[in-house]
Amino acid sequence: MLNLISSLQKSAQLLTLYLDKFRKDYGVTQPEAHVLAVLHVRGETSIRNLHHTLGHKPSTLTSILDRLVARGFITRETSQTDRRSFNVELTLAGTVPAAVIRAALHSLENKIVRRSVSTDIRGITRVASTLEELIVSTRRAE
C-alpha cells in the first residue's frame, strides 16, 4: 500500500526540485537553502535550534554549515552565554539569497494554503509531527 509514505516521499522530492533553481542562482543545495531560509526568519540562532528545526543528523548539519561558511553566507561563532554551544548567523553576502529563498518558500506555502482547507493543513502538520516522533524515538532506541 504505502500511499501515505509515497505521498510524503513525492512531496519531499518536489520540494527538492523546486529549490533546485537556487543551486543555479546561488550555488546552494536544498538543505543549504532551508538553513538560509530559517536564518532569514529567525536571525542568529544556535546550531541546536537548527538541528531541532530541520531534523538533520548533527554530522550532516555540520557539513551543510561548513559549506555555507566557506561560501561566506553565514558565520558560526561560539555562543556568548554558553561556550559549549555555537550560534549561526547570516552574513551580508548570505542575506540576499536567504531573502529570495525565504520569499519563494513563503509564496509556495501560501499557494498551497489557498488551495487547501484548514483541516488539510492541520492534518499534514499532525502527520509530520507523528513522523518526527516515530523516527526520533526509533533512532534513540537503536
Identify what each model region corresponds to.
Residues I47-R48, S59, D66, F86:
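Residues within helix-turn-helix
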